[in-house]
Amino acid sequence: MNTLKSLLGAHLPKHAIILGSALGSVVDAVQDATDIPYAELSGFPIPKISGHAGKLVLGKIGGVEVAVLAGRAHAYESGNAAVMRPALEQLKDAGIEILILTNAAGSLKASMRPGSLMLLTDHINCAGMNPLIGQHGDENFVSMTNAYNADLRKAFLAAAKKEKIAVKQGVYCWYSGPSFETPAEIKMIQIIGGTAVGMSTAPETILARRLGLQVAAISTITNLAAGIKGASPSHEETKREGMKAAGDMKRLLTRFFKDIK
């Protein structure tokens, strides 16, 4: 098994991207790409669900060196909220400073339709677990203030404006899954301030902040949440709508990296 650092070669990325469900085609934006299957990387978890390729892609987006993780493992696959910890630790060890997370999410607002993009301003942990449980040391008492970096969010909003992509902002609620949320659960998280709901991202953000990485996160809205008129969430809908939104995600990421180059 290899470590990511040992395989970088001439690549020296400071930015990493984790792609959510059905967003695998975003790797088409990577120029001079080198693919490394997760199976060849020590500690990288192999995703067990469709819509997650399970490979690392090294190259450039918008002229900036990036490491793109095409797919993630979820807490519901093993019961381990820290399932992405080994991968994030290797990213940190390889020199990554900024982590951009993407995900598929259900909208808690009827006006935010499937196909929309939403920048995360914050999250609410509704999963009853935390990826830092069981780790020792005072450094695990991580501040989650500005967990989703405000400066990175401004840069993404500027990029979206240039590309004429309508991007919302909101609070992401993490449920463990794999079952979708009940209408009663959706009503509850609407009341407490949620904007979208999904099964990933929050534990990765907690781990990334523990490692000292700056984080930005973008949801692709793939369905209306349970209980909202017209909603009938399914994994097939998630994959279908995720693929539709991938084009806007590619344009947004490309413009973001061109602007920071």
Model features per residue range: what roles?
Residues T3, L7-A10, D151, A155-I165, ...:
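Generic non-transmembrane alpha-helical segments
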Residues E97-I98, T195, Q214:
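Short acidic/polar active-site loop segments enriched in Thr and Asp
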